[in-house]
Protein backbone atom coordinates (compact mmCIF):
# COMPACT_ATOMS: atom_id res chain seq x y z
CA UNK A 1 0.00 0.00 0.00
CA UNK A 2 1.53 3.26 -1.16
CA UNK A 3 1.06 6.61 0.59
CA UNK A 4 0.58 9.24 -2.09
CA UNK A 5 -0.18 12.23 0.11
CA UNK A 6 -2.98 13.17 2.53
CA UNK A 7 -6.09 11.11 1.92
CA UNK A 8 -4.43 8.95 -0.70
CA UNK A 9 -3.37 5.38 0.09
CA UNK A 10 -3.62 2.73 -2.60
CA UNK A 11 -1.94 -0.36 -4.04
CA UNK A 12 1.00 0.40 -6.28
CA UNK A 13 4.48 -0.58 -7.36
CA UNK A 14 7.75 -0.01 -5.53
CA UNK A 15 11.29 -0.92 -6.43
CA UNK A 16 12.58 -4.30 -5.31
CA UNK A 17 14.40 -3.67 -2.01
CA UNK A 18 18.15 -4.24 -2.03
CA UNK A 19 20.91 -4.26 0.56
CA UNK A 20 22.23 -0.71 0.88
CA UNK A 21 24.26 -0.89 4.07
CA UNK A 22 26.26 -3.74 5.64
CA UNK A 23 23.78 -3.77 8.54
CA UNK A 24 20.72 -4.27 6.31
CA UNK A 25 18.59 -7.35 5.78
CA UNK A 26 15.86 -8.07 3.26
CA UNK A 27 12.78 -9.72 4.74
CA UNK A 28 10.15 -11.50 2.67
CA UNK A 29 6.89 -10.58 4.35
CA UNK A 30 4.63 -13.48 5.32
CA UNK A 31 2.05 -11.80 7.57
CA UNK A 32 1.37 -8.17 8.39
CA UNK A 33 -1.28 -6.00 9.95
CA UNK A 34 -2.82 -2.55 9.77
CA UNK A 35 -2.08 -0.10 12.57
CA UNK A 36 -4.04 2.96 13.59
CA UNK A 37 -0.83 4.86 12.81
CA UNK A 38 -1.30 3.83 9.17
CA UNK A 39 -4.69 5.54 9.30
CA UNK A 40 -3.05 8.65 10.75
CA UNK A 41 -0.59 8.64 7.84
CA UNK A 42 -3.44 8.26 5.36
CA UNK A 43 -5.20 11.22 6.98
CA UNK A 44 -2.12 13.41 6.55
CA UNK A 45 -1.63 13.69 10.32
CA UNK A 46 1.99 12.46 10.24
CA UNK A 47 4.01 15.29 8.65
CA UNK A 48 7.20 13.22 8.53
CA UNK A 49 5.57 10.56 6.31
CA UNK A 50 7.15 10.60 2.84
CA UNK A 51 4.81 10.35 -0.16
CA UNK A 52 5.62 7.41 -2.40
CA UNK A 53 6.62 4.97 0.34
CA UNK A 54 4.95 1.66 1.13
CA UNK A 55 3.39 1.93 4.57
CA UNK A 56 3.28 -0.75 7.24
CA UNK A 57 5.36 -1.39 10.34
CA UNK A 58 3.58 -4.43 11.84
CA UNK A 59 4.85 -7.56 10.13
CA UNK A 60 6.75 -10.81 10.36
CA UNK A 61 8.59 -12.67 7.66
CA UNK A 62 11.57 -14.70 6.55
CA UNK A 63 15.08 -13.31 6.08
CA UNK A 64 15.98 -13.52 2.41
CA UNK A 65 19.37 -11.79 2.35
CA UNK A 66 21.70 -10.02 4.77
CA UNK A 67 24.47 -7.45 4.59
CA UNK A 68 28.08 -8.26 5.34
CA UNK A 69 27.85 -6.69 8.80
CA UNK A 70 24.89 -8.74 10.05
CA UNK A 71 25.92 -11.40 12.56
CA UNK A 72 22.92 -12.25 14.76
CA UNK A 73 20.46 -13.05 11.99
CA UNK A 74 20.83 -15.61 9.23
CA UNK A 75 19.11 -16.25 5.92
CA UNK A 76 15.99 -18.35 6.42
CA UNK A 77 15.23 -17.11 9.93
CA UNK A 78 11.59 -16.41 10.74
CA UNK A 79 11.62 -12.97 12.33
CA UNK A 80 9.45 -10.32 13.91
CA UNK A 81 10.29 -6.82 12.72
CA UNK A 82 10.69 -3.99 15.19
CA UNK A 83 8.56 -0.94 14.38
CA UNK A 84 11.48 1.26 15.45
CA UNK A 85 14.80 0.83 13.67
CA UNK A 86 17.82 2.07 15.56
CA UNK A 87 21.58 2.25 15.20
CA UNK A 88 22.37 1.43 18.83
CA UNK A 89 25.30 3.85 18.84
CA UNK A 90 24.03 7.44 18.95
CA UNK A 91 23.43 9.37 22.18
CA UNK A 92 19.73 8.52 22.31
CA UNK A 93 20.18 4.84 21.48
CA UNK A 94 22.83 4.46 24.18
CA UNK A 95 20.25 5.69 26.69
CA UNK A 96 17.54 3.35 25.37
CA UNK A 97 15.61 6.17 23.67
CA UNK A 98 15.61 4.48 20.29
CA UNK A 99 12.56 6.37 19.04
CA UNK A 100 14.89 9.36 18.80
CA UNK A 101 17.74 7.57 17.02
CA UNK A 102 19.59 10.22 15.01
CA UNK A 103 20.52 7.96 12.09
CA UNK A 104 18.56 8.81 8.91
CA UNK A 105 17.20 5.24 8.95
CA UNK A 106 16.47 5.28 12.69
CA UNK A 107 13.36 5.88 14.77
CA UNK A 108 10.01 5.47 13.09
CA UNK A 109 11.36 4.92 9.61
CA UNK A 110 9.63 1.78 8.36
CA UNK A 111 6.39 2.59 6.62
CA UNK A 112 6.83 6.29 7.31
CA UNK A 113 10.10 7.57 5.83
CA UNK A 114 11.26 4.38 4.08
CA UNK A 115 9.30 1.53 2.54
CA UNK A 116 7.56 -0.63 5.11
CA UNK A 117 5.94 -4.02 5.33
CA UNK A 118 2.70 -3.71 3.37
CA UNK A 119 4.68 -5.07 0.46
CA UNK A 120 6.13 -8.39 -0.61
CA UNK A 121 9.57 -7.55 0.78
CA UNK A 122 11.15 -4.90 2.96
CA UNK A 123 14.65 -3.65 3.66
CA UNK A 124 15.33 -3.60 7.40
CA UNK A 125 18.13 -1.28 8.57
CA UNK A 126 20.22 -2.36 11.56
CA UNK A 127 18.96 -5.93 11.24
CA UNK A 128 20.88 -7.21 14.26
CA UNK A 129 19.01 -4.73 16.45
CA UNK A 130 15.66 -4.74 14.74
CA UNK A 131 14.88 -8.34 13.83
CA UNK A 132 13.89 -10.87 16.49
CA UNK A 133 13.99 -14.59 15.64
CA UNK A 134 10.67 -16.35 16.18
CA UNK A 135 11.00 -19.63 18.12
CA UNK A 136 9.58 -22.78 16.57
CA UNK A 137 6.86 -22.93 19.22
CA UNK A 138 5.54 -19.45 18.32
CA UNK A 139 3.33 -19.00 15.25
CA UNK A 140 3.50 -16.04 12.90
CA UNK A 141 0.22 -14.74 14.29
CA UNK A 142 1.38 -15.10 17.89
CA UNK A 143 4.50 -13.09 17.01
CA UNK A 144 2.79 -10.54 14.75
CA UNK A 145 2.24 -7.82 17.36
CA UNK A 146 5.67 -8.18 18.98
CA UNK A 147 7.37 -5.33 17.15
CA UNK A 148 4.70 -2.68 17.62
CA UNK A 149 1.67 -3.06 19.89
CA UNK A 150 3.28 -5.35 22.43
CA UNK A 151 6.42 -3.20 22.35
CA UNK A 152 4.21 -0.17 22.93
CA UNK A 153 2.55 -1.87 25.88
CA UNK A 154 5.90 -2.91 27.34
CA UNK A 155 7.29 0.61 26.97
CA UNK A 156 4.19 2.22 28.48
CA UNK A 157 4.15 -0.12 31.46
CA UNK A 158 7.88 0.33 31.97
CA UNK A 159 7.92 4.13 31.96
CA UNK A 160 4.71 4.12 33.99
CA UNK A 161 6.83 2.89 36.89
CA UNK A 162 4.24 0.31 37.90
CA UNK A 163 4.65 -1.13 41.36
CA UNK A 164 3.21 -4.38 42.67
CA UNK A 165 -0.53 -4.18 43.42
CA UNK A 166 -0.92 -0.79 41.68
CA UNK A 167 -4.26 0.13 40.18
CA UNK A 168 -3.62 0.89 36.52
CA UNK A 169 -6.26 2.65 34.42
CA UNK A 170 -6.06 2.26 30.65
CA UNK A 171 -8.12 4.79 28.71
CA UNK A 172 -8.98 3.12 25.42
CA UNK A 173 -9.79 -0.59 25.11
CA UNK A 174 -8.69 -1.04 21.52
CA UNK A 175 -5.81 -3.31 20.49
CA UNK A 176 -3.10 -0.96 21.77
CA UNK A 177 -4.89 -0.37 25.05
CA UNK A 178 -5.31 -4.08 25.58
CA UNK A 179 -1.61 -4.67 24.89
CA UNK A 180 -0.83 -1.97 27.46
CA UNK A 181 -3.12 -3.74 29.93
CA UNK A 182 -1.44 -7.09 29.27
CA UNK A 183 2.00 -5.67 29.91
CA UNK A 184 0.86 -3.76 32.99
CA UNK A 185 -0.38 -7.01 34.48
CA UNK A 186 2.82 -8.80 33.51
CA UNK A 187 4.80 -6.09 35.33
CA UNK A 188 2.90 -6.56 38.56
CA UNK A 189 -0.22 -4.39 38.45
CA UNK A 190 -2.76 -5.52 40.99
CA UNK A 191 -5.85 -4.22 39.20
CA UNK A 192 -6.51 -3.22 35.59
CA UNK A 193 -9.34 -0.79 34.86
CA UNK A 194 -10.24 -0.37 31.19
CA UNK A 195 -12.13 2.78 30.19
CA UNK A 196 -13.87 3.13 26.82
CA UNK A 197 -17.16 4.32 25.34
CA UNK A 198 -17.25 1.28 23.02
CA UNK A 199 -19.15 -1.40 24.93
CA UNK A 200 -18.21 -4.07 22.40
CA UNK A 201 -14.53 -3.52 23.07
CA UNK A 202 -15.04 -3.49 26.83
CA UNK A 203 -16.91 -6.79 26.62
CA UNK A 204 -14.16 -8.24 24.42
CA UNK A 205 -11.52 -7.24 26.96
CA UNK A 206 -13.41 -8.74 29.89
CA UNK A 207 -14.29 -11.94 28.03
CA UNK A 208 -10.59 -12.54 27.35
CA UNK A 209 -9.39 -11.63 30.82
CA UNK A 210 -7.53 -8.48 29.81
CA UNK A 211 -9.15 -6.30 32.49
CA UNK A 212 -10.55 -6.60 35.99
CA UNK A 213 -13.00 -3.69 35.84
CA UNK A 214 -14.45 -1.88 32.82
CA UNK A 215 -15.97 1.59 32.76
CA UNK A 216 -18.03 3.29 30.05
CA UNK A 217 -17.67 7.03 30.80
CA UNK A 218 -20.66 7.82 28.60
CA UNK A 219 -22.91 6.17 31.18
CA UNK A 220 -20.75 5.99 34.32
CA UNK A 221 -18.65 8.43 36.32
CA UNK A 222 -15.14 7.07 35.75
CA UNK A 223 -13.67 9.23 38.52
CA UNK A 224 -16.18 7.90 41.04
CA UNK A 225 -15.73 4.27 40.00
CA UNK A 226 -11.96 4.43 40.40
CA UNK A 227 -12.19 6.35 43.66
CA UNK A 228 -14.45 3.61 45.03
CA UNK A 229 -11.90 0.98 43.98
CA UNK A 230 -8.96 2.82 45.55
CA UNK A 231 -10.35 4.17 48.83
CA UNK A 232 -10.65 7.60 47.29
CA UNK A 233 -7.10 7.91 45.98
CA UNK A 234 -7.41 7.41 42.24
CA UNK A 235 -5.37 5.31 39.83
CA UNK A 236 -1.66 4.90 40.55
CA UNK A 237 -0.76 4.80 36.86
CA UNK A 238 -2.84 5.89 33.87
CA UNK A 239 -2.20 5.08 30.22
CA UNK A 240 -4.03 7.31 27.72
CA UNK A 241 -4.41 5.32 24.53
CA UNK A 242 -7.64 6.62 22.99
CA UNK A 243 -6.32 9.91 21.62
CA UNK A 244 -9.26 12.26 22.08
CA UNK A 245 -9.98 15.46 23.99
CA UNK A 246 -12.35 13.73 26.39
CA UNK A 247 -10.01 10.78 26.89
CA UNK A 248 -7.10 13.03 27.81
CA UNK A 249 -9.22 14.74 30.43
CA UNK A 250 -10.37 11.39 31.77
CA UNK A 251 -6.76 10.25 32.03
CA UNK A 252 -5.67 13.01 34.37
CA UNK A 253 -8.89 13.23 36.39
CA UNK A 254 -8.91 9.51 37.31
CA UNK A 255 -5.24 9.68 38.35
CA UNK A 256 -4.37 10.02 42.01
CA UNK A 257 -2.11 12.88 43.11
CA UNK A 258 1.53 12.22 42.19
CA UNK A 259 0.54 9.54 39.67
CA UNK A 260 2.26 8.88 36.36
CA UNK A 261 0.13 9.50 33.25
CA UNK A 262 1.59 7.88 30.14
CA UNK A 263 0.39 9.39 26.86
CA UNK A 264 0.49 6.51 24.39
CA UNK A 265 -2.00 7.91 21.87
CA UNK A 266 -1.12 9.78 18.70
CA UNK A 267 -3.30 12.90 18.47
CA UNK A 268 -4.44 14.51 15.25
CA UNK A 269 -5.21 17.84 16.96
CA UNK A 270 -3.62 20.04 19.61
CA UNK A 271 -4.74 19.27 23.15
CA UNK A 272 -5.14 21.59 26.13
CA UNK A 273 -4.14 20.83 29.71
CA UNK A 274 -6.14 23.03 32.13
CA UNK A 275 -3.26 23.78 34.47
CA UNK A 276 -5.30 25.80 37.00
CA UNK A 277 -7.60 22.81 37.51
CA UNK A 278 -4.66 20.44 37.73
CA UNK A 279 -2.70 22.51 40.21
CA UNK A 280 -1.83 20.48 43.27
CA UNK A 281 -2.19 17.03 41.71
CA UNK A 282 1.56 16.98 41.00
CA UNK A 283 1.14 14.61 38.08
CA UNK A 284 3.99 13.34 35.94
CA UNK A 285 3.15 13.14 32.23
CA UNK A 286 5.24 10.96 29.93
CA UNK A 287 4.61 11.00 26.20
CA UNK A 288 5.26 8.73 23.18
CA UNK A 289 6.47 7.42 20.83
CA UNK A 290 7.51 4.01 21.84
CA UNK A 291 11.14 3.14 22.49
CA UNK A 292 10.70 -0.30 20.97
CA UNK A 293 13.86 -2.14 21.93
CA UNK A 294 12.47 -4.96 24.09
CA UNK A 295 11.37 -7.41 21.40
CA UNK A 296 13.62 -10.26 22.54
CA UNK A 297 12.14 -10.13 26.04
CA UNK A 298 8.61 -9.88 24.63
CA UNK A 299 9.23 -12.91 22.41
CA UNK A 300 10.38 -14.86 25.48
CA UNK A 301 7.18 -13.84 27.28
CA UNK A 302 5.12 -15.13 24.35
CA UNK A 303 7.07 -18.39 24.14
CA UNK A 304 6.69 -18.96 27.89
CA UNK A 305 2.94 -18.32 27.75
CA UNK A 306 3.10 -15.23 29.95
CA UNK A 307 1.25 -13.10 27.40
CA UNK A 308 -1.04 -13.99 24.51
CA UNK A 309 -2.20 -11.41 22.00
CA UNK A 310 -3.60 -13.86 19.44
CA UNK A 311 -7.24 -13.27 20.52
CA UNK A 312 -6.80 -9.71 19.23
CA UNK A 313 -6.53 -11.05 15.67
CA UNK A 314 -10.22 -11.19 14.85
CA UNK A 315 -10.06 -11.07 11.05
CA UNK A 316 -7.81 -12.42 8.29
CA UNK A 317 -7.36 -11.28 4.69
CA UNK A 318 -4.98 -12.10 1.85
CA UNK A 319 -2.83 -9.18 0.74
CA UNK A 320 -4.74 -9.03 -2.55
CA UNK A 321 -7.76 -7.85 -0.51
CA UNK A 322 -5.95 -5.37 1.71
CA UNK A 323 -8.18 -2.49 0.61
CA UNK A 324 -11.15 -4.39 2.06
CA UNK A 325 -9.14 -4.93 5.23
CA UNK A 326 -8.43 -1.19 5.49
CA UNK A 327 -12.11 -0.39 5.09
CA UNK A 328 -13.12 -2.88 7.78
CA UNK A 329 -10.43 -1.71 10.19
CA UNK A 330 -10.97 2.02 9.72
CA UNK A 331 -14.75 1.71 10.08
CA UNK A 332 -14.45 -0.64 13.10
CA UNK A 333 -17.03 -2.97 11.61
CA UNK A 334 -17.87 -6.52 12.66
CA UNK A 335 -16.14 -6.23 16.04
CA UNK A 336 -12.73 -5.93 14.41
CA UNK A 337 -9.68 -5.59 16.65
CA UNK A 338 -6.65 -6.56 14.56
CA UNK A 339 -6.40 -8.00 11.06
CA UNK A 340 -3.78 -10.48 9.92
CA UNK A 341 -2.91 -9.84 6.29
CA UNK A 342 -1.16 -12.81 4.71
CA UNK A 343 0.98 -12.38 1.64
CA UNK A 344 -0.36 -14.28 -1.35
CA UNK A 345 1.75 -15.02 -4.36
CA UNK A 346 -0.72 -13.31 -6.70
CA UNK A 347 0.70 -9.98 -5.58
CA UNK A 348 3.57 -8.51 -7.51
CA UNK A 349 5.72 -5.52 -6.66
CA UNK A 350 3.50 -4.00 -3.98
Regions found by a protein language model. Give the residues of each.
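Glycine-rich beta-strand-centered segment in the early N-terminal region that forms part
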Residues: 15-32, 45-94, 135-138
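Cysteine-cluster motifs in flexible loop/terminal segments that predominantly coordinate metals
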Residues: 35, 72, 82-132, 136
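Conserved acidic E/D residue at the C-terminus of a beta-strand in Rossmann-like folds
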Residues: 196, 265, 289
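C-terminal hydrophobic helical "lid"/dimerization subdomain
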Residues: 220, 225, 237, 249-253, ...
Amino acid sequence: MIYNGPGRLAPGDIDEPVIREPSDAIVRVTTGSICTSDLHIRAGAVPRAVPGIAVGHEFVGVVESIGSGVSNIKIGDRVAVNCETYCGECYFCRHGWVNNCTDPNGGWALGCRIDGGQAEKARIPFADNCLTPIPDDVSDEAALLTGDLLSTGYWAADIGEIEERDTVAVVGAGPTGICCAMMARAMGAGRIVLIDVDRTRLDFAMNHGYGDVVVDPSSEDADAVIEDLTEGRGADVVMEVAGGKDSLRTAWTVARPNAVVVIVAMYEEDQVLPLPEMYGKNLVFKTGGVDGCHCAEIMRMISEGRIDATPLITHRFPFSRIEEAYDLFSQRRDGVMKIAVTMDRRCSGV
